Structure formats: C-alpha cells, structure tokens
Regions:
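Extracytoplasmic
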Residues: 6-38, 116-117, 147, 151, ...
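Conserved MFS/SLC helix-loop-helix module at the cytosolic interface between two early adjacent transmembrane helices
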Residues: 57-96
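Glycine-rich segments within core transmembrane alpha-helices of 12-TM secondary carriers
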Residues: 128-162
Length: 282
C-alpha cells in the first residue's frame, strides 16, 4: 500500500469533493425558499429529490459504462457532469435551473461512487480494504462538517452590508459573479473551481486497472430482472431508502426547522447545527 499513497490521497480528495458538494443542501434550503419565493417545503424538497433520483437512474448504467470503457473515462465523466451542473446554476439563477443542476450533479455523483469503491480496493489492496473504506468515510464526514462552515463564511463576507472591496481578490471575484441578494450562489463557483481541479487531476493521473470480482461485474438484462424478482433485494432497497431518507431528510431540513419553529438564523446557527450533525455522524 505504501507505494500507492499518492493515489490513495487522490482518492480521498475525490471523496472529500463529493461530500463537500453533496451535503451542502441543508444550509441552502432556507435561502432557496426565500430567494425563489417557494410556497411550501414540498417545492424545496424537489431539489434533493432531483439529486437522489439521479442516483437511482445512473447506478446501473454507471456499472455498465465501467465494464465497457474502464474506470478513468467514467471517473472523468463523473466529475464533468457536476462541473456542468454547478456552472449552469452559477450562471443562471432560477428555480428550474437549480432543479436541473441538482439532477445533473446527482448523475455525476452516482458515477463517481460506483467507480471509486472498487478503485480504492485495487489501489489499497484487498487486505486493507476495510481500513481504506473507513478512511474514505472519515474524509466524507469531514467535508460534510466543513461545507456548512464555508457557506456561513461566504454569506458573511459577501453580505452587501459588510462586504468591503479589496479585502481579498477571491472574494472580489465572487462578489462580481454573484447576485447581491443571493450570496449563497458563490458556493457554486467554489464547487466549479474544485471540480475543475479534480478534472485536471483525473486527466493527468494513471489509474490501475480494476480487477472486478465476479459478483461486482455488471450482468445481463436477465440477471437484473432475476434480482428484481427477489423479495430480499427489495427489502435491502427499502432499508437503504429508509436510512438515507432519515439521514438526509434530517440534515436537509434541520436549518429550516430551526428557523421556522425556533427563530434561529439559518445562515449562522442553522448552518452550524448542520455542520455539527455531520461532524457527530462521522
């Protein structure tokens, strides 16, 4: 494993990026409701729904793409999709575009998670797979903890009432590219830059060929149909659905709940609560 430490570090950076973008929705929901004048929480709920619906759609095709084209092209496309999604909304700040952006980002994230799990086993070695998987989850949690704090920082620094030009070149650029009444959109420019770095990293890196186990290879159409006929497959699906719904539902609407029922400022204490939630989950 020692000779692959650089590659492992890159994979951990991939997981960090995925989580940093994926778990920011909680702090953003109150801003989305206010800026787009959404009448109820159901309208806001379509944002995470579009994101996770993309997972359901892309999971099986992602496996087929890995079998046909290999891990590097799928990894590159996995970062390219959210790059396109984030830059679209960063440039066009409408509710329909946010829905489309979330869906496109979700497609890419599904591709990334499908390819990264077998890749980290190949790079780290079969005997270290459990440790590498736990390390990846740790990086995932750290990014989830930090992203709401990054949101609060940008909101505070880009607030028209407190923003001072010339304080920072990066902040000046973000201020120029972000609507004054929607400073949270600056996060999408940060995501775009982060994803661009990941695309370059994938482009210049040489990844080992993934040797998939027999039970990891994508099967034929008949094999999928046979799986869907098994009741335990549906029970597993239901279990994952309930877990993810509980975890993501809590984090996504926590800040909104605290604002509406307890008068908590969603841009500071609300975002901090989401950060602590992910930190404790880690």
């Amino acid at each position: 494993m020692k000779k692959n430490l650089g590659m492992l570090a890159l994979i951990m950076a991939f997981w960090f990026t995925i989580s940093f973008i994926t778990n920011i929705l909680g702090p953003l929901i109150p801003d989305i409701i206010h800026n787009f004048n959404l009448s109820d929480l159901a309208m806001a709920g379509f944002i995470p729904t579009s994101f996770f619906l993309a997972y359901a759609i892309m999971s099986i095709p992602a496996g087929l793409l890995i079998d046909r084209f290999g891990e590097k092209p799928v990894l590159f496309c996995g970062f390219l999709m959210p790059f396109i999604g984030t830059i679209l909304f960063a440039c066009m700040h409408t509710y329909p575009m946010l829905l489309a952006s979330s869906f496109i980002i979700g497609l890419g994230m599904a591709m990334l998670q499908t390819v990264l799990n077998p890749l980290q086993r190949t790079v780290g070695g079969e005997e270290n797979y459990a440790f590498i998987a736990e390390l990846a989850q740790f990086m995932f949690g750290i990014a989830s903890f930090l992203s709401p704090l990054a949101y609060t920082y940008l909101i505070r620094e880009l607030d028209p009432a407190t923003y001072t030009a010339g304080k920072s070149l990066i902040l000046d650029l973000l201020a120029d590219m972000t609507p004054q009444d929607m400073p949270w959109v600056s996060l999408y420019w940060v995501f775009t830059l982060l994803l661009l770095v990941m695309l370059i990293a994938v482009g210049v890196s040489h990844f080992p060929k993934i040797e998939l186990k027999e039970d990891e290879k994508s099967g034929s159409k008949d094999s999928y149909l046979a799986l869907f006929k098994q009741k335990y497959v549906w029970l597993f699906f239901l279990g994952i659905f309930c877990y993810v719904s509980t975890e993501q539902g809590t984090s996504i609407f926590m800040s909104t709940f605290l604002e509406q029922y307890h008068g908590v400022n969603p841009q500071t204490e609300g975002a901090q609560a989401v950060s602590y939630f992910w930190g404790l989950m880690t």
